[in-house]
Regions:
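C-terminal active-site/capping subdomain that shapes the small-molecule cofactor and substrate pocket
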Residues: 56-167
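Active-site-lining helix/loop region of Rossmann-like oxidoreductase modules
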Residues: 1-91
Length: 167
């Protein structure tokens, strides 16, 4: 953040990144591994499979974008069966802590500034993926300082207690 703030002010003495970050997008988050992915990208792959206790086919490219906070992801999901997009969106609307911002006619879609200070996850740009059968695309945004591992752990713990899953 210090480098970004200094670049806004025209200073360039503090360089956390090898390149200017102001008005830039850097596809390099964490160290590169032998497989060409970064540690952060592999963390996304491994944590997703760990959470779902499966071997979901997943890939990721992590990009550093100069915003003061927030994580954004473009997600492509392939389902086993055909689906009705409106039914899927209705189902997503029922998830606690998930807010749909998906009205492209009025230019409403998730952006990092919506998420600032919120525990909600914002989802939009929900559409069928024409490149792959039974697939959809969506854009997801959350405040990484609020909706990270700690908040998720608290929410999961509350759910476990509420459903009497532990003594």
């Amino acid at each position: 953040m210090e480098q970004l703030e200094n670049e806004y002010e025209g200073k360039s003495d503090v360089m956390a990144y090898n390149y200017q970050i102001h008005q830039n997008a850097i596809p390099h988050c964490d160290d590169f591994l032998e497989n060409g992915y970064t540690k952060e990208e592999m963390k996304l792959v491994n944590e997703t499979n760990k959470i779902f206790n499966s071997d979901i086919s997943i890939t990721a490219t992590a990009v550093r974008i100069p915003v003061m906070g927030g994580h954004s992801e473009s997600i492509n999901i392939t389902l086993e069966n055909p689906f009705d997009l409106n039914e899927l969106i209705s189902e997503l609307k029922s998830f606690n802590g998930l807010e749909i911002k998906d009205d492209i006619t009025n230019n409403i879609y998730p952006m990092p500034f919506y998420s600032r200070g919120s525990n909600n996850v914002y989802v939009g740009r929900i559409r069928k993926d024409f490149s792959c059968e039974n697939s959809l695309n969506l854009w997801v945004v959350a405040d990484n300082l609020r909706k990270g591992a700690a908040t998720n752990a608290v929410q999961i713990a509350k759910l476990i207690v509420k459903n009497n899953l532990i003594n």
